[in-house]
Amino acid sequence: MQICVFFCTFAAVFCVLWFKRRHSKQTMIDNQLIFRSFASGSSGNCYFLGTSNWGILIDAGISARTIQRNLREMGLDYANIMGVLVTHDHADHIRAVGTLGERVHLPIYSTRDIHNGIDRNYGVREKLRTSQRYFEKGIEWELNGMKINTFGVSHDSTECVGYVIDFMGQRILIVTDCGQPNATMEMYLSTANHVIIEANHDEGMLLNGPYPTYLKERILSPKGHQSNVTCGELLARNWHTEMRNVFLCHLSHENNEPEVALNTIKDILLDEGIMPGEDVFVTPLERIKPSPVYVLNDQIIKP
């Protein structure tokens, strides 16, 4: 009998302590802004930004099933998603928007020109009929407390936009595809706390690689993709003491490697006296494998 009482008491105490620890940890996470990349690259792009209770998706260039699996790993589902923000109408960014918009009934946000491009894209089998939501570049709007600004980005799509999202005291800049930086992009970069930015290719790998000439020229053009060097110089030029974390996105499988991108950008920052890991956290996002869940706050992420 005494043994039974002991184990029952021990179990009760353990359950109380476990609940308190879990509740305390969950409350801490609930009060934080979190970011996770589900995929980042020419084979598909999709990012989550929000809290442990709800969030938004930026682009949906992977299957709806894969997106849902990643959400469920975070304890979320489509019911917790307030909408999808689309950067442009290339297939690797919009593969699942038809399914998410018309079957899951998520609002799909973008400019009218981008929505027209989505409608013409044969890769989107389920056409958007009722889920389109339009915004105009340069006009701030709000989604569940997130203040969202958009600006034009140079890329060879129907239209391409970058996003600036202010939420929970943090400013997040998202530029996934960019052939040439512009003044508006640099203005927002100089005030952003957290940056998701393209580092698509190493120029030497591209020029010496197997791509045909026309494709190399397209990538290197002002409406193509941003190189590691351009990305590094852009960050160094606009770094400020409130910039905390930089996530390198849309790395090419054929013309880049995560270590190459990271080392190139770190070297450029170091040349300008900016210490990666101390002054700013920089990490490449993987093409297919989802990233860890990152908490975005006033602290620099420590690997």
Positions of predicted regions on the chain:
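Metal-dependent catalytic neighborhoods of phosphoester/phosphodiester hydrolases
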Residues: R95-V104, R120-N121, N256-N263
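Metallo-beta-lactamase
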Residues: R112-G162, D166-G169
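Active-site metal-binding motif and surrounding structural segment of the metallo-beta-lactamase
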Residues: R65-T111
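Active-site neighborhood of phospho(di)ester-bond hydrolases with catalytic His/Asp-centered motifs
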Residues: I58-G61, M82-D89, S110-R112, L173-T176, ...
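Conserved beta-strand hairpin/beta-sheet module of binuclear metal-dependent hydrolase folds
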Residues: T9, L17, K25-M74, E159-D177, ...
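Short, basic/aromatic-enriched C-terminal tail that caps enzymatic domains
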Residues: F281-P303
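Cap/insert and terminal regions of metallo-dependent hydrolase folds
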Residues: A183-T283
